[in-house]
């Protein structure tokens, strides 16, 4: 049968390739093997094709015939295993980067096939922007249905993780602590729950149930139309950011509308606090009932008497479902959820370390890994486990139990302490950790897909903010951070497309980063908003009066204090580098023309040097003792002056004698023959 298939394949090749004598030698075993493998896969790579092509000169007709023959056989010729992704990326980037894809094959040797398709990809790998764009282009855009599907996966993963956390007693212990902290005023409500999601959650979730599809579609179109208008307005005001290097702002009217429509965080807290406290009280009461059943379950495992009765199991499930429903209604802050997950993972890590120590000890005595796991699984808290393994007939069990008796007991005691800390059995704890990990993994994968599919949106927005103090890749990075926040907060039930929602977050992240990082001297965001407002008003008045407005006119127009306007205009100026070239030849810098207030002027330096020299000559005309006394008393040529007592100690005489020597020396200096030389310095 295999021989017949091979003969059919060769017949196909001979029938399709015979007319012009194609490049492939069909009698060659390597060619036959390559074609057979290519038919199974549906493609052949350039490297594989080049390895079987002849090395002599060939015509373009032969190359075209070979490519056509392979195509007719259902075999695609690709560059490499990842060529399809690269091709998709090249299609997206080709217009921007001026690349020519799929050009005509030139007459050459067999390697010419690869040369025509491998031109650009290897040349542009050094440019990180092009590499990023190429990889980004390999991801397909999402449709509206695709966005909803991924959003549902994110929601399902998060709910799985929350459900796992709700089965852990540690979660409810933390919730009770947070409730007490709220009552005592030690923490804010916004630190425990997501205020915006909790405040708008019920209305948002109810929308699909109580609104018709036509109404939802109409609202969505109205929102998109409003977004287009807002983008147009923002584009008209984009130049404001260029002038001040700050954050782009929408028109003032829109800002005022947003302020009116959004409640403050304090108002949200005041409105939600009673409801949240009531929910936390319900959780605390329900958990007390559940805790009793969990304690009974752990005691049953420790006593090796089995599990709960069927009635207790049903009651346990009912209480657990009530708690899960109550916790979901809270919309916990993501930071709090992360803290709960981290707590679970930390205990799981300690449990794994102890069990790993126990396994390694057993293996050191020749116990098989599979045998150990078979005996250990399900008996983590069994008090009779030591007795049972010491009676096993398998290799190493008796030696292991006898030699490491105390170590085994210590490790199992630590494991039992972990079970007591978690409030549930080890098997149940492992199941909860696995459930949380599964939900977190599913949500993370779905979020990654949503982010990667919308990277083009970040590029399109970041292009508008170039040349404003940050490099293009930095803008993309900040925009991607905003995109990830948008994915975390996206609510598909509202009926809007993700791009409509994400645009605000991306623009906000980019403009905030420009405000924080673009300027050498950082200006607060609220001050940048004031600068933008003044710049817009100044441009408007320029069109009205035909000249730049004065600070007084701006203050009157904006109803702002004159001093504040002047202060803002002064702040808006960009710092200039002292290394800025000056002149056409650029051989001097701006710093060369700035006066140094601390530097000594040349004339003053000359006068000081002349005074020092003249004083030295005049003092040299006195006796050595008189000269030294004057120098020490007045600090001439020394670090500091000296008192009469200090000078007297140097010469081993009294203070009075030093005073007399000083007075005599000063009288000598007042003589016209000496004073005449120093008098000229008084005028200077």
Curated annotation (Swiss-Prot):
Signal peptide: none annotated. GO terms for cellular component: cytoplasm. A motif (Interaction with polymerase core subunit RpoC) lies at residues 474-477. It comes from the Bacteria. It holds the Pfam family Sigma70_r4. Residues 1-26, 83-128, 203-262 are annotated as: Disordered. Residues 450-520 are annotated as: Sigma-70 factor domain-2. One of its GO terms (biological process) is DNA-templated transcription initiation. Residues 644-663 bind DNA. One of its GO terms (molecular function) is DNA binding. Keywords: Cytoplasm, DNA-binding, Sigma factor, Transcription, Transcription regulation. Residues 83-102, 250-261 have a biased composition (Acidic residues). Its main location: cytoplasm. InterPro entries: RNA_pol_sigma-70_dom, RNA_pol_sigma70, RNA_pol_sigma70_r1_2, RNA_pol_sigma70_r2, RNA_pol_sigma70_r3, RNA_pol_sigma70_r4, RNA_pol_sigma_70_non-ess, RNA_pol_sigma_70_r1_1. It is found in: Cytoplasm. Residues 618-671 are annotated as: Sigma-70 factor domain-4. Gene3D superfamilies: RNA Polymerase Primary Sigma Factor, Sigma-70 factor, region 1.1, Winged helix-like DNA-binding domain superfamily/Winged helix DNA-binding domain. Residues 1-18, 117-128, 214-228 have a biased composition (Basic and acidic residues). Residues 529-605 are annotated as: Sigma-70 factor domain-3. Interacts transiently with the RNA polymerase catalytic core. Belongs to the sigma-70 factor family. RpoD/SigA subfamily. Sigma factors are initiation factors that promote the attachment of RNA polymerase to specific initiation sites and are then released. This sigma factor is the primary sigma factor during exponential growth. HAMAP family: Sigma70_RpoD_SigA. This is RNA polymerase sigma factor RpoD. The lineage of its organism: Bacteria, Pseudomonadati, Pseudomonadota, Alphaproteobacteria, Hyphomicrobiales.
């Amino acid at each position: 049968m295999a021989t017949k298939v091979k003969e059919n394949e060769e017949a196909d090749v001979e029938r399709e390739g015979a007319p012009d004598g194609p490049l492939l030698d069909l009698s060659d075993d390597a060619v036959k093997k390559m074609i057979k493998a290519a038919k199974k896969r549906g493609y052949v790579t350039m490297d594989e094709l080049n390895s079987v092509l002849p090395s002599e000169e060939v015509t373009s007709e032969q190359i075209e015939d070979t490519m056509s023959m392979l195509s007719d056989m259902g075999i695609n010729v690709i560059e490499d295993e990842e060529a399809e992704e690269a091709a998709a990326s090249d299609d997206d980037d080709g217009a921007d980067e001026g690349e020519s894809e799929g050009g005509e094959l030139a007459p050459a040797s067999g390697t010419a096939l690869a040369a025509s398709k491998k031109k650009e990809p290897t040349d542009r790998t050094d440019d990180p922007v092009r590499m990023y764009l190429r990889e980004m282009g390999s991801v397909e855009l999402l449709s509206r249905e695709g966005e909803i599907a991924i959003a549902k996966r994110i929601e399902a993963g998060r709910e799985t993780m929350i459900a796992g956390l709700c089965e852990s007693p540690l979660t409810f212990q933390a919730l009770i602590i947070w409730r007490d902290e709220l009552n005592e005023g030690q923490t804010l409500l916004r630190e425990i729950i997501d205020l915006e999601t909790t405040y708008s959650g019920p209305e948002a979730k109810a929308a699909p149930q109580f609104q018709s599809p036509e109404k939802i579609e109409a609202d969505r179109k109205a929102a998109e139309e409003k977004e287009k208008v807002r983008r147009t307005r923002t584009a008209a005001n984009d130049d404001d950011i260029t002038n001040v290097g700050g954050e782009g702002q929408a028109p003032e009217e829109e800002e005022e509308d947003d302020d009116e429509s959004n409640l403050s965080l304090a108002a949200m807290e005041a409105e939600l606090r009673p409801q949240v406290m009531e929910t936390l009280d319900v959780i605390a009461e329900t958990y007390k009932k559940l805790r009793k059943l969990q304690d009974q379950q752990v005691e049953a495992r420790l006593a090796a008497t089995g599990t709960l009765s069927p009635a207790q199991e049903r009651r346990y499930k009912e209480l657990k479902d009530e708690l899960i429903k109550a916790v979901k209604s809270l919309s916990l802050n993501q930071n709090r959820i992360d803290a709960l997950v981290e707590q679970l993972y930390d205990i799981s890590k300690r449990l794994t370390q102890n069990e790993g120590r126990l396994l390694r000890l057993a293996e050191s005595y020749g116990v098989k890994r599979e045998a150990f796991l078979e005996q250990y699984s399900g008996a983590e808290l069994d008090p009779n486990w030591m007795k049972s393994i010491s009676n096993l007939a398998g290799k190493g069990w008796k030696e292991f139990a006898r030699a490491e008796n105390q170590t085994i007991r210590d490790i199992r005691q630590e494991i039992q302490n972990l079970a007591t800390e978690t409030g549930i059995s080890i098997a149940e704890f492992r199941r909860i950790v696995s459930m949380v990990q599964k939900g977190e993994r599913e949500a993370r994968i779905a979020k990654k897909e949503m982010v990667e599919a919308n990277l083009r949106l970040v590029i399109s927005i970041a292009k508008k903010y170039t040349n404003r103090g940050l490099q293009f890749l930095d803008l993309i990075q900040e925009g991607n951070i905003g995109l990830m926040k948008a994915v975390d907060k996206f609510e598909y039930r509202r009926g809007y497309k993700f791009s409509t929602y994400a645009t605000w977050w991306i623009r906000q992240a980019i403009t905030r980063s420009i405000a924080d990082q673009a300027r050498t001297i950082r200006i607060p965001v609220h001050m940048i908003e004031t600068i933008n407002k003044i710049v817009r008003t100044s441009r408007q008045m320029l069109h009205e009066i035909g000249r730049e407005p004065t600070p007084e006119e701006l203050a009157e127009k904006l109803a702002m204090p004159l001093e504040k306007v002047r202060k803002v205009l002064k702040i808006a100026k960009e710092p200039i580098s002292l290394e800025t070239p000056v002149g056409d030849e650029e051989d001097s810098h701006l710093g060369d023309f700035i006066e140094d207030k601390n530097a000594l002027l040349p004339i003053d330096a000359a006068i000081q040097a002349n005074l020092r020299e003249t004083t030295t000559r005049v003092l040299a005309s006195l006796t050595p003792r008189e000269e030294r006394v004057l120098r020490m008393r007045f600090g001439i040529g020394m670090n500091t002056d000296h008192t009469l007592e200090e000078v007297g100690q140097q010469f081993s005489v009294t203070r009075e004698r030093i005073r007399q020597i000083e007075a005599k020396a000063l009288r000598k200096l007042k003589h016209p023959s000496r004073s005449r030389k120093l008098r000229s310095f008084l005028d200077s």
